[in-house]
Amino acid sequence: MTQNIITVKKEHIIENVISKSRFIAHIKPVQNEDEAKAFIAAIKKEHKDATHNCSAYTIGPEMNIQKANDDGEPTGTAGVPMLDILKKLDVHNACVVVTRYFGGIKLGGGGLIRAYSGAVRDVIYDIGRVELREAVPCIVTLNYDQTGKFEYKLASTHFMLRNQTYTDKVSYYIDVVKSDYEAFINFLNQMTAGNFDLTEETPKQLPFDIPTE
């Protein structure tokens, strides 16, 4: 069975200003260490005039690979605190780079730790996390007179509506976690008295939103 993992929704950037220093946090989901290294290199190239480009990443369902780099900041004040936030929020397969433009005021060790870890926490909170779960992409096609009740009830379930299209009928693109598939079929039967068309695609790892606490 494929293990579910948590990562970030997509690439994202936020900026914090602390004591006149700019801390720009860039985060991206990655599949392997090569992708992480390429992302770090791209950010360093984009911000080659920055004072520091500190980085951290985790790879694998068990975070088998964990790397952190202070990029010239005092040892333990940037990369490791950044990595600690990834681990605390259980974010796998993600790379984060925090770019610092020094503003002339020294923050001290504690201040740096708070600034770098805070930037990582903020960028994750801002974009949000997803859980990659093995799911079945489904297309459910209904007559127009069935849609009102169906949509109302669907909104109160955990089945993930991705899209819907309208022709002579209405098609709903819904992702269903494999373990919930039988319950989904029961739901369809209850809502339509068995009057529906269903197309199933090959199961795959799909993202489902989860709260960031």
Identify the residue ranges that each predicted region occupies:
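Short glycine-/aliphatic-rich beta-strand segments at the starts of folded cytosolic domains
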Residues: 128-146
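Short amphipathic alpha-helix segments
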Residues: 141-159
